[in-house]
Amino acid sequence: MSTPPLTPPTMQEVHVWQWDLDACGGEFDRHREMLSMQEHERAGNFRFELHRRRYVTGRGKLRQILGRYLALPPQAVALEYGSEGKPFCTNQPVGWRICFNLSHSENTAALAVSGGFEVGIDVEQIRPIEESMPLQVFSSREREQFDALPPSEQQTVFFETWARKEAGLKALGTGFILPPEHFEFDLSDHGDTMPRFVGGAADEASHWRVRALSPGPACAGAVAARQTGWSVIQMN
């Protein structure tokens, strides 16, 4: 069944798609047919069938959506990877620069698509916090704020902040090759925000915007870009 084409986002928009990886089981065979040879090989490396099916569904859905923007069949979308592993699309029309980023946590998947600037997205299932995690993720200032929070708030604030940081690092294309404290936030800020520091510099932080997502119950999310004046358009 054909799907209608999509108008690409403007320079002031980030399109955000969200879906349940476990609710697309009926499309598994169709999604598998869309994958590249490299993606098939990676799918075969998963130890557990649930994880393999989620990977196939996520990549198939990614190809479906990008294909609608590019007016291409899903299997014709050409994906390559930057030096730090961030994927990008190589067969775009002349003058186009659609950027995207995909994230998933358990069964929750989210895709950000932007027009002309790099974007990062992250979703995190809210789960128990291991004792070492705040030390690994927070700067010293953030840890002071975190430790002062009521215990009832710590879990949600931790994963909200983690999602912001990872979205920023993914926008840079590095992931956790850079330390999480490369992005520092004021933990009293909720919803849309900007970093307090990026790489220790307040001036660099002024170029960034981070938008909050609500991916679902017990789940935190964020979209980040080194770009001002943009807004999130929910696509589903």
State the predicted function of each range:
Residues M1-N236:
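Core catalytic alpha/beta fold that binds nucleotide/phospho-ligands
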